[in-house]
């Protein structure tokens, strides 16, 4: 008689973590009335891209925002240009465009409602919302290393 065939069952899959803590910025900032990526913001986006390359299950929603000092229509378009330039920068860093969605809120979701120069700088931003497509909770840090304050005008 033939010896019995021994089948080794496959190892059970490793359980997914409950939460992933990412040392990853959640926003980048822009100069007054600009949508181009500054050198400092570019460094922030490169840091984000590096983390995203290590975590292929994470997708991103980009939301463009402005300060309140123009018409709502203009600010909607400016917020969208900011979100697009941020997406394009991520794509140039090797992140697949399918992982990124963009939208603009213009001036409708101010980070801070006050009206000094620092508050305006905080409002001129693109926010990153990260989601793990497997449903794992993500813990994210915020940063302001690339705030771009405008120069005070001389009277």
Show the residue positions of the predicted features.
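Periplasmic OmpA-like peptidoglycan-binding domain that tethers envelope proteins to the cell wall
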Residues: 63-155
């Amino acid at each position: 008689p033939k010896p019995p065939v021994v089948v080794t069952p496959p190892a059970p899959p490793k359980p997914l973590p409950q939460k992933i803590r990412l040392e990853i910025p959640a926003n980048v900032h822009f100069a007054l009335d600009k949508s181009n990526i500054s050198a400092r913001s570019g460094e922030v986006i490169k840091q984000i891209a590096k983390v995203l390359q290590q975590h292929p299950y994470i997708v991103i929603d980009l939301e463009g925002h402005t300060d309140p000092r123009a018409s709502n229509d203009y600010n909607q378009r400016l917020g969208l240009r900011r979100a697009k330039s941020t997406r394009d920068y991520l794509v140039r860093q090797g992140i697949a465009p399918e992982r990124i969605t963009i939208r603009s809120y213009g001036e409708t979701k101010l980070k801070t409602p006050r009206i000094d120069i620092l508050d305006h700088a905080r409002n001129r931003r693109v926010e990153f919302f990260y989601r793990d497509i497997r449903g794992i909770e993500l813990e994210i840090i915020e940063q302001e290393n690339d705030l771009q304050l405008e120069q005070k005008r001389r009277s």
